[in-house]
Amino acid sequence: MPPEADAPPILEFHQVHRHFGHQQVLRDVSFTIRRGESVAIIGESGCGKSVTLKLMIGLMSPSSGSVLLDGAPIAGRSEQQLTRDRLRFGYVFQQAALFDSLSVADNVAFGLRQNTRLPENEIAAIVHERLREVGLPDAVAAKKPAELSGGMRKRVGLARALALAPEIMLYDEPTTGLDPIMSDVINELILQVRARRPITSIVVTHDMVTVGRTVDRVIMLYPLPRLGSDEPQIIFDGTPAEAFSAPDPRVYQFVHGQAGERLLEMATR
């Protein structure tokens, strides 16, 4: 469900540039994401998608331009403030990045123990609820991550991200490495997360089926080496259905190459 038209901005990029030495990754990138919006950031490898996510949570700063969280620049904030800001985000990594020495339950509880003073019985209740939400049975809680399939590890990562009740969910290639059936399970969970709580959802992905299933808006970045010096790096900003029928051949080729008939089915439901 799209947010209200007058929903306040939660994240803003204003003429953002990012260099690594002499290599420019982002050039003059501007967009606004409103509270409660669900947005996919797509594009070929090397176009700056992951850098964009890192800028959102203050893991790096723009070379020029500004990134705003709730209307205030992220750059220049103290480490203490950045730590508080990052607790507002839930991050689902491309690889689950679980602690192999800890049980599933302790992985999900990790952020709660590090960042809250909740008693253990309340932490245990939250862990149980989050595992239930992502469709994992109680028996999984005592297992180690190495005992789980890739799809189950993804679900544990999602449960951990949800444990601290984030305002903004960031998904970095959430279906990479999964078969179509498990990809559909993860896509459905992303939808359920949005349905159950007021949350802003940002998905970085190559999977256009995920785009068609889980978001209302698509932003496409294009690799700078293949753009003219005066061309904008954002070459598309619209709905998934509009992306599928976009007249720009660069958008059309990417979208159809990634999803084909499956995206058409999703976009025209």
Task: Give the positions of each predicted feature.
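Helix-to-loop junction immediately C-terminal to a conserved catalytic motif
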Residues: I57
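Conserved ABC ATPase "signature" region
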Residues: P73, E120-A139
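ABC ATPase NBD coupling module
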Residues: I74-G90, Q114, E120, A243-A246
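Short coil-to-helix segment of the ABC ATPase nucleotide-binding domain corresponding to the Q-loop/switch region
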Residues: L102-F110
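Conserved ABC ATPase signature
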Residues: K144-L148, M152
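Conserved catalytic motifs of ABC-family nucleotide-binding domains
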Residues: A165
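Catalytic Walker B motif of ABC-type/P-loop ATPase nucleotide-binding domains
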Residues: M169-D172
